[in-house]
């Protein structure tokens, strides 16, 4: 790592540590836990949806091309070069 990358990393860590941390005791209760259990009752059997039709049979897997998988190897587009 060069000096600029180390300096940026140091600044990011310092900013993350300097942020005030929230106290979990002061956070409000989640709404799902506050809801009464009767609200989550199951619908009656008459209102249930009909079962879905069966899925069509899966197609046979295709063989890989003779030259390999066809994908380029050793390519990383997520590299950022500084300097």
UniProtKB/Swiss-Prot annotation:
What are its GO biological-process terms? defense response; sexual reproduction
Naming one, the record's GO cellular component terms include:
extracellular space
Residues making up the signal peptide according to the UniProt record: 1-18
Which tissues does it occur in? Answer: Adult male abdomen.
Per UniProt, the ranges with Low complexity bias are: 28-49
For region Disordered, the annotated ranges are 23-83
In which residue ranges is the amino acid composition biased (Pro residues)? 50-59
* Keyword presence, Signal: yes
Q: Per UniProt, which keywords does this protein have?
A: Signal
Protein task: May be a male specific regulatory factor.
Q: What is the designated name of this protein?
A: Male-specific opa-containing protein
Output the lineage of the source organism. Answer: Eukaryota, Metazoa, Ecdysozoa, Arthropoda, Hexapoda
Q: Which gene encodes it?
A: msopa
């Amino acid at each position: 790592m060069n000096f600029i990358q180390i300096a940026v990393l140091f600044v990011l860590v310092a900013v993350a540590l300097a942020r005030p941390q929230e106290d979990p005791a002061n956070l409000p209760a989640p709404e799902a836990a506050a809801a009464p259990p009767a609200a989550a009752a199951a619908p009656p059997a008459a209102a249930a949806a009909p079962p879905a039709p069966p899925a069509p049979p899966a197609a046979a897997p295709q063989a890989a091309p003779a030259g390999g998988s066809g994908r380029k190897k050793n390519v990383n587009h997520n590299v950022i070069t500084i300097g």
